[in-house]
C-alpha cells in the first residue's frame, strides 16, 4: 500500500478512525490496522491495492467469506476489517464492526451467491448444467441434500470438498476415537452409497481400519442376500430390480439406480441408510480396536482431579459397544467404585444415586495441593496425639483428656479455644482478677500480697474532713475482718502494758523486809 494509508483519503481516514472495534468497547480503528491488513493480504494471494476501492474490497470479501466460519482468528479479523473498509468506501455510516459486517451481508447477498455458485457448478449425469428454476429439494431434506429433483427426474449432487475435508481432518485428529461415529453420522446424513464410498476412499491412511469396515460390509451384505432372495423368473419389462447386497454397497449399482431405489421405486428401498448402518457397525469395531481400554480399567489416580477422571470414564463409556441400559448400569456402579479413596469417602456420604453435578461439586478440589496439605496436617496431628498417649501409658496410669482452662470443655487446650479469652485466678478460680491480685487468701499475719508497704499494727487515722455520706456497701471480705480482730487485740495489749501492776494490801506488811532489818534497810 505504499505509505500504508493510501487505501483511504483524508476524509475516509477520519471516518475510519471513528469506528469502534466492538460495540461496547472504547478502542477504535487506527492506521496500524491498515498496515497489518496489507501484510495479511499476501498470505491469501491477494494484492494489497484491492483495499483502495469498493470493488476490490468486494472481491476480497467473496474470497474470505467461505473461509470465515471455520477460519482462524487472524482470518476473521481480516474479514471484519475489509467489511469496515467496504462501508467506508461506500459512504455507509457505521459505528462498530458488527454493523459493518451486517451491512456487507445485506449488500453483497453472500449467502444467496454461494448457494447459486454451488448449484451452477454441479452438472447432470448427461453433462448438461442444471437449471436452478427447476431444481427442488426433497421433502424433509436440507439444501445440501445429495439428490435434487429437476422436473420428474432426480439429479445427484456430489459431496462438497469442504465436507470431505472436514471428514479427513476428523479422522486424522481423532484417530478413530469415540467421536468418529457421531461425526460420520452427521456428515453422511441422506447420502447415497456412492457418496459414502467416496468418504471412505479419501482416507489415505488407516487402511487396517478400513479393511475391518470392508469385512463388516461383506458380512452384512451376505446376510442381506440370504434374507432377501431374488424373485424367481425374469422381471417384467421396465421394472426395477431389487437391490442385492453388492448393490447396496455400491459396487454393482450405478448412481442413477441408487437414486431410483431411494426415491422412485415401489416399494422404496433406502439403500443409502442401509449402507450407512453397515459402515457405522464397522466404525464401532474400529473404535473398539483403537481404544482397547475398557471402562472396567478406568480408575482415578491418587492425585488426579475428579473432573478429569469423569471425562476419561465417560469417554470409555462412549466407546463401549453396549446398550443404553448396560451403559447406565456401568455408570451408576463403576463411577463411584473406581474413584480414589478420598473421593470415594465423599461420594458415599452423598446418599443413594447422587447426580453428576452433586458429585463434581462435592469432590471439587480433592487431590489438589491445598487438600493434600490439609490431609497431611490432620495425619501429623493424629500421629502426635497417639505418640503422646503411648508415652503416657508407659509411665503408669493414662493421662486424663485435655481440658480447656478458658471454657472448661474437654478436647482442646486454652490456645485452641474458639471462645474469647477470660481472665481467671489460679488460686480461687474466680474470674476477673489474677493470682497475684487475689484477695481470697491471706498470710499468717492477716495481710495479703496486694499490699505494697509494711503493714501497721493499728488502723491509720484519716486526717481531714470525713465525708457525711455513708460509705458504699462493700462485699464481705474475711481478710478485713481478720485484720480488724488483730488490730483490736493489739490495742488491748497496749492498754494493759500502760496500767501498773495490781498490789494486794495484805502483802505490804507481812512480806516487807522492814520487819526483819528495821531501819538498816
UniProtKB/Swiss-Prot annotation:
InterPro entries, A to Z: Gag_p24_C (IPR045345), Lentvrl_matrix_N (IPR000071), Matrix_HIV/RSV_N (IPR012344), Primate_lentivir_Gag_pol-like (IPR050195), Retrov_capsid_C (IPR008916), Retrov_capsid_N (IPR008919), Retrovr_matrix (IPR010999), Znf_CCHC (IPR001878)
Short sequence motif PTAP/PSAP motif: positions: 467-470
Span list, region Disordered: 116-144, 489-521
Residue ranges of the motif Nuclear localization signal: 26-32
Domain of life, source organism: Viruses
SMART domains the UniProt entry points to: ZnF_C2HC
Gene Ontology cellular-component terms listed: host cell cytoplasm; host cell nucleus; viral nucleocapsid
Keywords from the named record: Capsid protein, Host cytoplasm, Host nucleus, Host-virus interaction, Lipoprotein, Metal-binding, Myristate, Phosphoprotein, Repeat, RNA-binding, Viral budding, Viral budding via the host ESCRT complexes, Viral nucleoprotein, Viral release from host cell, Virion, Zinc, Zinc-finger
Pfam entry (one): Gag_p17
Keyword Nucleus: no
Residues with a covalently attached lipid (N-myristoyl glycine): 2
MF GO annotations: RNA binding; structural molecule activity; zinc ion binding
SUPFAM superfamilies recorded: Retroviral matrix proteins, Retrovirus capsid dimerization domain-like, Retrovirus capsid protein, N-terminal core domain, Retrovirus zinc finger-like domains
Site (Cleavage): 443-444
Motif Nuclear export signal, residue numbers: 16-22
Gene Ontology process terms (BP): viral budding via host ESCRT complex; viral translational frameshifting
Zn finger (CCHC-type) start-end: 402-419, 423-440
Record PTM text: Capsid protein p24 is phosphorylated. Specific enzymatic cleavages by the viral protease yield mature proteins. The polyprotein is cleaved during and after budding, this process is termed maturation.
Keyword Zinc-finger included in the entry's annotation: yes
Domain comment (free text): Late-budding domains (L domains) are short sequence motifs essential for viral particle budding. They recruit proteins of the host ESCRT machinery (Endosomal Sorting Complex Required for Transport) or ESCRT-associated proteins. p6-gag contains one L domain: a PTAP/PSAP motif, which interacts with the UEV domain of TSG101.
Functional summary from the UniProt entry: Matrix protein p17 targets Gag and Gag-Pol polyproteins to the plasma membrane via a multipartite membrane binding signal, that includes its myristoylated N-terminus. Also mediates nuclear localization of the preintegration complex. Implicated in the release from host cell mediated by Vpu.
Protein family: Belongs to the primate lentivirus group gag polyprotein family.
Leftover remarks: This is an African green monkey isolate.
Protein name, per record: Gag polyprotein
Species the sequence originates in: Simian immunodeficiency virus agm.vervet (isolate AGM3)
Amino acid at each position: 500500500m505504499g505509505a500504508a494509508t493510501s487505501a483511504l483519503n483524508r476524509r475516509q481516514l477520519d471516518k475510519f478512525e471513528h469506528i469502534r472495534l466492538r460495540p461496547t468497547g472504547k478502542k477504535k480503528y487506527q492506521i496500524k490496522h491498515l498496515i497489518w491488513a496489507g501484510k495479511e493480504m499476501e498470505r491469501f494471494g491477494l494484492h494489497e491495492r484491492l483495499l483502495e476501492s469498493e470493488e476490490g474490497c468486494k472481491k476480497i470479501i467473496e474470497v474470505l467469506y467461505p473461509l470465515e466460519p471455520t477460519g482462524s482468528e487472524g482470518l476473521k479479523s481480516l474479514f471484519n476489517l475489509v467489511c469496515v473498509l467496504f462501508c467506508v468506501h461506500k459512504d455507509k455510516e457505521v459505528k462498530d464492526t458488527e454493523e459493518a459486517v451486517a451491512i456487507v451481508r445485506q449488500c453483497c447477498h453472500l449467502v444467496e451467491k454461494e448457494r447459486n455458485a454451488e448449484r451452477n457448478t454441479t452438472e447432470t449425469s448427461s453433462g448438461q448444467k442444471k437449471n436452478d428454476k427447476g431444481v427442488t429439494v426433497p421433502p424433509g431434506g436440507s439444501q445440501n441434500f445429495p439428490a435434487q429433483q429437476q422436473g420428474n427426474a432426480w439429479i445427484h449432487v456430489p459431496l462438497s470438498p469442504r465436507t470431505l475435508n472436514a471428514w479427513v481432518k476428523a479422522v486424522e485428529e481423532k484417530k478413530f476415537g469415540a467421536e468418529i461415529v457421531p461425526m460420520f453420522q452427521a456428515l453422511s446424513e441422506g447420502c447415497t452409497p456412492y457418496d459414502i464410498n467416496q468418504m471412505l476412499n479419501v482416507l489415505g491412511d488407516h487402511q487396517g481400519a478400513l479393511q475391518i469396515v470392508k469385512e463388516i460390509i461383506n458380512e452384512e451384505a451376505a446376510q442381506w442376500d440370504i434374507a432377501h432372495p431374488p424373485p424367481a423368473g425374469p422381471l417384467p419389462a421396465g421394472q426395477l430390480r431389487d437391490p442385492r447386497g453388492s448393490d447396496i454397497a455400491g459396487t454393482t449399482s450405478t448412481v442413477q439406480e441408487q437414486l431410483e431405489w431411494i426415491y422412485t421405486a415401489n416399494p422404496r428401498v433406502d439403500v443409502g441408510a442401509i449402507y450407512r448402518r453397515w459402515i457405522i457397525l464397522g466404525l464401532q469395531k474400529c473404535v473398539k480396536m483403537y481404544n482397547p481400554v475398557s471402562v472396567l480399567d478406568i480408575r482415578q489416580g491418587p492425585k488426579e482431579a475428579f473432573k478429569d477422571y469423569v471425562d476419561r470414564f465417560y469417554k470409555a463409556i462412549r466407546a463401549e459397544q453396549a446398550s443404553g441400559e448396560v451403559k447406565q448400569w456401568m455408570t451408576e456402579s463403576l463411577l463411584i467404585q473406581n474413584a480414589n479413596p478420598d473421593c470415594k469417602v465423599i461420594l458415599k456420604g452423598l446418599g443413594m444415586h447422587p447426580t453428576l453435578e452433586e458429585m463434581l461439586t462435592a469432590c471439587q478440589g480433592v487431590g489438589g495441593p491445598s487438600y493434600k496439605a490439609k490431609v497431611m496436617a490432620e495425619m501429623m496431628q493424629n500421629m502426635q496425639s497417639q505418640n503422646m498417649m503411648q508415652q503416657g501409658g508407659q509411665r503408669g496410669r493414662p493421662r486424663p483428656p485435655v481440658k480447656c482452662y478458658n471454657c472448661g470443655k474437654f478436647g482442646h487446650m486454652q490456645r485452641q479455644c474458639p471462645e474469647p479469652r477470660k481472665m481467671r485466678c489460679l488460686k480461687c478460680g474466680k474470674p476477673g482478677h489474677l493470682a497475684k491480685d487475689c484477695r481470697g487468701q491471706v498470710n499468717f499475719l492477716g495481710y495479703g500480697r496486694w499490699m505494697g508497704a509494711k503493714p501497721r499494727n493499728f488502723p491509720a487515722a484519716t486526717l481531714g474532713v470525713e465525708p457525711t455520706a455513708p460509705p458504699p456497701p462493700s462485699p464481705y471480705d474475711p481478710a478485713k475482718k481478720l485484720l480488724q480482730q488483730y488490730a483490736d487485740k493489739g490495742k488491748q495489749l497496749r492498754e494493759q502494758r500502760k496500767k501498773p501492776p495490781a498490789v494486794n494490801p495484805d502483802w505490804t506488811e507481812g512480806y516487807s523486809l522492814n520487819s526483819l532489818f528495821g531501819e538498816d534497810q
